[in-house]
Amino acid sequence: MVVVGGVNTNYRHYALVIVLFFFLNVYLLYSAQNSVQIRKDEGETREKFQTPKVPLVDPISTCEIVDELAKSAISRATSPGCKSKLQLEACQLKNGTFSESFPQSTCSNHQDALIDQRIGCFLDKKDARVLKEFEYKFPQSNSKSTCRKNCYKAGFLYYGLEFGLECFCGNDVANATEIDSGECRNYKCPGAEDEFCGGFNAVEIFRTDKLVMLKPKYLPPAENVSKPPIKILFLLQLNGRNERQVKRFLKSIYLPNHYYYIHVDKRQNYMYSEMAKIAEKVPNIHITSTRYSTIWGGASLLQMFQQVIRDSMEIEMFKDWDYIFNFSESDFPILPIQDFERLITEHQGKSFLASHGYNTGKFIQKQGFEFVFSECDQRMFRIGKREFPENLRIDGGSDWVGIHRDLAEYSISNEELPQKLRKTFESILLPLESFYHTLAFNSKFCDDLMMSNLRLTNWLRKQGCRCASLKQIVDWCGCSPLVFREDTKIKFEMQKAISKPTYFARKFDSMVDIEAIESAEQQSMSTSKIQMDHPTYHFAYANIFKFGIDEEKIAHRSLASFALNTIKSHEKMAKIVQIDALRAHHNAQIEIVMKVETQSGANFEFLIHRKSHVNLSTSGALEVDGYVLKDVVYGTKFEWKEEICREYMGFVTEKDTLHTRLEWSPTERVKKNDKTSPEIEFQYRNGPEKIDKSIVKPYDSVFGGQFDSWDVGKRLSNLSTCPDFFVDVFSPSSSESPLATLRFSVYTEQNVDCHVAYLRDFFEIVDFCTSETACGEKIWSMSYPDPKSDIQVGWDEEARILR
């Protein structure tokens, strides 16, 4: 060992290295801090409307999950990221760190001095309630604080305590009979032992702190509006593949002085590609590339809406809008767009929100506000119950809104209330139905509301509240409106629309009933702009397949080859270019239009007709328990609400669920409030061999429908042969002969050799064309003009319409 000056040289080397590392760390820290500061300075101008950063989910559990809702949700999540997100949020909920505390309301309808102000003790009976609007029961937690909080959030003026556990809410005590105060001191509050919660048939009533219920009066527009014109941002939230109906809607609402902003669901690439073509032709139409999967009930819908607000303010040509109104692909105007424009101008500064139309307390329950939902794996999972803060007023109604610029800017700002509400509404079902209502009612904007969104919705809850279609995407049951048909379009007749007034209506679907759209169009547009005598005026189209966007299915390829062989063409198919469904009239059968490119580069277009293989009993025995069987249809992608199959080509594969629909007509022997169909037995067979059966109970349908669903893949295996499958429909009381029999085929990649025989039985090539010129003369062709929806040039100033 060498020692110099009493110091080991090895230690001197170590010390030198340590010193060098120290200065290196100091330099790196300085550089990082400087970089952060530079980025901060660059971002200051965008800070106000910047999209909030999404925090990373901690994958580590912080607690033991005991809530059954949370345990169920985590077990059903498919991705690790979703399971981790649900686990963390369930722990936050359990630990009390999930909810926010909110600032005091700045609405003029709120006064602190009224909080818990005692009104008195009143006689109360089950059949003669003082506070009639809503009732809660809190066996463990009832108290003044608990009751007030729940009545406050529903917007009521008064809350009342009774029988220990009962909490009542209402807005009127004018006709109440006051009794001795001692009658209201018979039961201790289970949630506060030093308080009393009323007596037997005795309710003690207090104020929440609301002054009056705000009900802005609707003012009809004057004929001449002296106020400066407004600019509206029309937000089109699009889904599906019926782009021709969207174009028709756009033509009906387009004015060059407004803005049109298009968001297409992230999963709908065909619609996106078609809308992008329009945006290229018309300068004040913009399609955003920032796309969300807007599932039913999901938080993503509100996030998308607010992202559009942020982004539109940064687009130079679009940034000066005054209002944002959102619409879907199934909306249509029922009064002239100029009248709508005039009314909005008359009420500048007001936002247009539709109320739920009934008791707020019931609305809160039906909307699932009391539960926490979490969106991941394209599903809304329910993970537990929530506690809302005492001072938050909740309200809601429709998610089709008209928001003034001031409220829109406030909603995306970093002020405390909107910032905390955005966070809270990430875990609320259908957030756009209540976010802006709640934000306005708890802020200075509560006086700037018109409680109407100027829309008419075709509600029929008996039919629209079918939960079957929602089971795959949400842990809840919700309602959707129905499509307008011949018997319901009277709802939007001119005088009814004016009296509300309502300027738009929904839902419309050209593949269900195009005549309803025609009625709305003729009512809202000048007839000089509508070519009612055009051959395709009654035609409805919906795209099924587009090359470069969709994956080709084996059954589609088989049909294309079959079509070429049927016309005795020697050409070989190279690719399917496009497939559309065509309905020539609202009562017509849906046909298939297929465009095929051959290996030589030639294009063929085919009109293809589907053959039905349904046999109804010829013995006349079609009546069961007073119901007469009228028709039997089958298909896949069944829509329970409208009772139609959205797989228009009629193919059934081993991956599908087969849906068989019976249509019944009641005789005079059926009582008025009975179901619309009898009990029926379905039997499934492979040739003569019975393979399954099911009993279907009586059903209640406004269309007289009754259904059975049969999972093909789970019931059948080894589908490499060419069997014929049958569904027999029997009356349970008579199984000797079926009421009806339908035949269907199952197309797989393993039984391709069977496809030609199947196609020969189930399809007919009705017509075809082989050139652009020839196809342009076929009214069924994709190339034939369709002026009601074509947008090929842009704005025609002279005709004042998109062409």
Swiss-Prot record:
One of its GO terms (cellular component) is endoplasmic reticulum membrane. It is a single-pass type II membrane protein. Pathway: Glycan metabolism; chondroitin sulfate biosynthesis; Glycan metabolism; heparan sulfate biosynthesis. SMART domains: WSC (SM00321). UDP-alpha-D-xylose binds at residues 265, 294-296, 399-400, 480, 506-507. Residues 115-209 form the WSC domain. Residues 35-803 are lumenal. Glycans are attached at residues 95, 175, 224, 326, 615, 718. Its main location: endoplasmic reticulum. InterPro entries: Glyco_trans_14 (IPR003406), WSC_carb-bd (IPR002889), XYLT (IPR043538). Pfam families: Branch, WSC. One of its GO terms (molecular function) is protein xylosyltransferase activity. It catalyses: UDP-alpha-D-xylose + L-seryl-[protein] = 3-O-(beta-D-xylosyl)-L-seryl-[protein] + UDP + H(+). It is found in: Endoplasmic reticulum membrane; Golgi apparatus membrane. One of its GO terms (biological process) is chondroitin sulfate proteoglycan biosynthetic process. Belongs to the glycosyltransferase 14 family. XylT subfamily. This is Xylosyltransferase sqv-6.
